[in-house]
Structure formats: C-alpha cells, structure tokens
UniProtKB/Swiss-Prot annotation:
Cross-referenced Pfam families: SDH_C (PF18317), Shikimate_dh_N (PF08501)
Classification lineage: Bacteria, Bacillati, Bacillota, Bacilli, Lactobacillales
Key words of the record: Amino-acid biosynthesis, Aromatic amino acid biosynthesis, NADP, Oxidoreductase
Subunit-structure text: Homodimer.
Gene Ontology MF terms in the entry: NADP binding; shikimate 3-dehydrogenase (NADP+) activity
Gene Ontology biological-process annotations: amino acid biosynthetic process; aromatic amino acid family biosynthetic process; chorismate biosynthetic process; shikimate metabolic process
Protein name in UniProt: Shikimate dehydrogenase (NADP(+))
Residues annotated as catalytic: K69 (proton acceptor)
Organism: Latilactobacillus sakei subsp. sakei (strain 23K)
Gene designation per UniProt: aroE
Reaction it catalyzes: shikimate + NADP(+) = 3-dehydroshikimate + NADPH + H(+)
Pathway named in the protein's UniProt entry: Metabolic intermediate biosynthesis; chorismate biosynthesis; chorismate from D-erythrose 4-phosphate and phosphoenolpyruvate: step 4/7
Gene3D superfamilies membership: Leucine Dehydrogenase, chain A, domain 1 (3.40.50.10860), NAD(P)-binding Rossmann-like Domain (3.40.50.720)
Family: Belongs to the shikimate dehydrogenase family.
Biological role: Involved in the biosynthesis of the chorismate, which leads to the biosynthesis of aromatic amino acids. Catalyzes the reversible NADPH linked reduction of 3-dehydroshikimate (DHSA) to yield shikimate (SA).
Positions with a binding annotation for shikimate: S19, L20, S21, S65, N90, D105, Y233
Amino acid sequence: MISGYTALYGLIAHPAQHSLSPFIHNTGFHQIQMDARYAVFDSQATPAAITSAIKTLGIRGVNLSMPYKQSLVPLVDNLTSTAKLVGAINTIKNEAGRLTATNTDGDGFWCALQKAHPQRRYRSVTILGAGGAALAVIEAAVRYGVQQVTVFKRANATYDSVIQRLAQISLASGLQIIVEPYDDQLALATALQNADCLINATNIGMTATPGNPLPINLLQYLPEDSLVADLIYAPRETAFLKTAQKAHYQIQNGLGMLIEQAALSFEFWTNESMATMPIYQHLTGGNDAS
C-alpha cells in the first residue's frame, strides 16, 4: 500500500511508456521489503525543470533516458568518475536535495555478458556506433579485461567531441582505443579479424529503425568463436543478431544490459542488491541470463 511514507523513484524520459524499468525496480523493492514505488514520468520538460521537480517533490532517485542523459549533466551537484568520463548519466540519487549522478550502462552491459558467458574473455572488441551507450560500454570495458577497442563512428556533427571524450577515457583507463570511419569496410574487415566481441551500439535494428548495421558479407571476417552482441532489447532478435546466429556465432541481446544496469542503479540508491535471476526468468519466459 502506498502511503505518505512511501519512497518514490522513477524513470524520466520521452517516450517512456514502453519501459520495463517499473517491473524491474518494483520487483527489487518487493524483494527487500522496502516501502518504495517506481513510476514512469514521460516528460518533455526542460532539464532545469526536471532537476527542480526531483528536489521539490522529494523523489529519492531517478533513471534517465533520452533526451536527458547529457542535458542534465551540468545541473546535478555531484558526478561519479564514470559519469564524468562518459559525459552522460542514467541514474540520479537525491539525498536531502543534493543530486549525485552516475552511469550504470557500461557496467550493466559487461555484467550481463559475464553472467551469460562466464568462461569468455574479451581482449579485443569492435563497436559499431559511438553514442552515449557506446561510450559507457567503452569506459567500463577495461574493468572486465578488455585491452583494445576499435570504434566505428560516423563523420557527423558529434565526431570531434566524441574523439576528445574517447581520448580522455583512454588516458584515464589505459585502454587502447582506435577510431575508424563507420563506412570504411576495409578497416572494419581488419578489425573484425582480431575481435573477440562485436557490438552493435547503433539504433539500427530497433523496431522504429529496422535494418542491419553491418554489411552481411563482412561478418565472415569475425573469428568463429567470437561473440556478437546488440545493445537493443526490442526486438529481442534484431536482423544483426539473426544474421550472426545463422552464421553460428553466439549472440547476446540488450535485455541483460537493461536488467543489470537497473540492478546497479538500485544498489546506488538503496545500498542493497537486487536478485536479478527471477527478473531474467520472468522476462525471458523461464530462460537464464543469456
């Protein structure tokens, strides 16, 4: 039962109605018997109005998605080192009106991969795309044994700023980061030959933006024991993953990343762990973390 003592958490984004986050977090609150509820706030308010509302309404913590992951960065009181390097936030904790923000996307991705494929090691990784989610995955990669990342980035308005941010991540972590033009198929074929993992971090393959981010003929250059991952979780099997599976590669969709980043946000707010296996089982119809 919701009362005046119930702590409020939520997702702030637009659009947001489709989100699985309320199910995940409310399951977590039930697990630890915490008097709290997680709601969805589909908002197009200004960033300043968002931070003001969090403080004024006493919302204990929020997740952020588009369009707020970058625009709220300068408006919070504290940033974790991860958030500073990535330049984007997905989690805010409100402690008596003081907002501390972090980014759990990258660690969420690698945690999901570890759970689904515990014996695998990833020294060299190729990533398609260099948006906020990709930067988070790259920033976290070194903590999971990755030594080199090759990023394929379109030459658009964000190119220079992304290059600068990747240089900062490399300097801070020691991770070797190579950036290539997205449409350079020779460079892509070369990178794939040495990749333990190929990741799609573009929006190509989402329900609203169907397609395949990789020319099908290039997949042959990827070693047969490599893993192919997609950050997209809707649909669960993108054209990219279907192509990889047909070529007998192990695959990983973005659902695990969604669950694990949520669990890390939950811990950031509550200092309690979320049991993720029941959530995996519910959302996959009884299957495990893979």
